[in-house]
């Protein structure tokens, strides 16, 4: 395993640990999720170039598109919770149900 692969794997697991540790605030959780998605994107792009499998070269871009959609939905939820409740606690997500 190359050192860059090891670094990106450690970055992914640190972001995963951040999701588990900072799960009370929505903003912290969203930042950790973005870190996970970014490390996955870079790791997949490096793996494709390292193994020279160019038939699946669009998968990192698709992952990046889904990551942008996830960020947009997460920020919309953050704005909705912040305007209605004044804070970004995740336990307020249960109050948004119809």
UniProtKB/Swiss-Prot annotation:
GO biological process entries: ATP synthesis coupled electron transport
Protein name: NADH-ubiquinone oxidoreductase chain 4L
Main function: Core subunit of the mitochondrial membrane respiratory chain NADH dehydrogenase (Complex I) which catalyzes electron transfer from NADH through the respiratory chain, using ubiquinone as an electron acceptor. Part of the enzyme membrane arm which is embedded in the lipid bilayer and involved in proton translocation.
Pfam family membership, one: Oxidored_q2
Compartment annotation: Mitochondrion inner membrane
Catalytic activity as recorded in UniProt: a ubiquinone + NADH + 5 H(+)(in) = a ubiquinol + NAD(+) + 4 H(+)(out)
Quaternary structure and partners: Core subunit of respiratory chain NADH dehydrogenase (Complex I) which is composed of 45 different subunits.
Bilayer-spanning residue ranges: 1-21, 29-49, 59-79
Similarity annotation: Belongs to the complex I subunit 4L family.
Gene Ontology MF term list: NADH dehydrogenase (ubiquinone) activity
Keywords: Electron transport, Membrane, Mitochondrion, Mitochondrion inner membrane, NAD, Respiratory chain, Translocase, Transmembrane, Transmembrane helix, Transport, Ubiquinone
Lineage: Eukaryota, Metazoa, Chordata, Craniata, Vertebrata
E.C. numbers: 7.1.1.2
GO CC aspect terms: mitochondrial inner membrane; respiratory chain complex I
Gene3D superfamilies in UniProt: 1.10.287.3510
Membrane topology: Multi-pass membrane protein
Main location: mitochondrion
